[in-house]
Amino acid sequence: MLQGFKNSRSLRGKVLDLDREELLLSSRAAAEKGQTRHADHIESKSRCKSLKISYNCDMKYFSNITAISELSESEGVFTTAQAARMDISRDALAHSCRAGRLERICHGAYRMSGTQRRDTDELNAFWKLTNPSLCAWERKRQWDGIAVSGTTAANLQQMGDFYLSPYRMTAPMRINTRNESLTFVKREIAERDIVWLDGLPVTKPERTLVDLCLDCEDPSLIIDAYNDALGRGLDTQRLKDLVEENSKTAKRRELMAPLLIALGCD
């Protein structure tokens, strides 16, 4: 009987050992299955994140193209600072240039490829870069005193035989530039003495003639410009007023001599 009891205990021990082994194997299998699921979850999550990033990049890309098109339609020539106001980065502008959608006119100014080119595109870029963050309509609404003047203004208004460039601009403050094709002169220009041409503030013929004298241009060319303007409705009274305002000293009066003679004021 004792021997039977011992055999029974030994059998139960073996059964318990088998149960433990099955439980251990089951636990290991469950753990491995859990690890596999976790790895699959991480991979799936990573794939979704990559797709999301790709989607966002594509959306940003098309958003930049749309914004650039809108800015170009509004401004024609536009600046890096104007683009930044529409959340268009420098990288996006550089990419558009490489892709052939944009043309770089000068440092910080662009135009859309395929649009009609104008002789004044470069001049427009230089003017906009004097206050790069503001749009043309904003500067037109609030006059800042910076205008195209002198020989450049005369060319734009077909007065005399002057070239468009080197470009000449007038500003109420001193503006320095290293660009050899652009010069600034410090002078006060009244808003009443400018006209907007091709999106640019240009001195009217009366003010342009006075500036040509102050810039020491050839007197014969000034008279030619005067005659051209006279045939297109020159405001001689306004011209007389401007000449008088700029003839306060003997030196200034000497500079104004071509116009004083033409107006019969000498």
Regions found by a protein language model. Give the residues of each.
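Short gly/ser-rich loop at a beta-strand->alpha-helix junction or flexible surface loop bordering the NTP-binding
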Residues: 41-44, 48-66, 72-81, 85, ...
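Long hydrophobic alpha-helical segments typical of transmembrane helices together
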Residues: 249-266
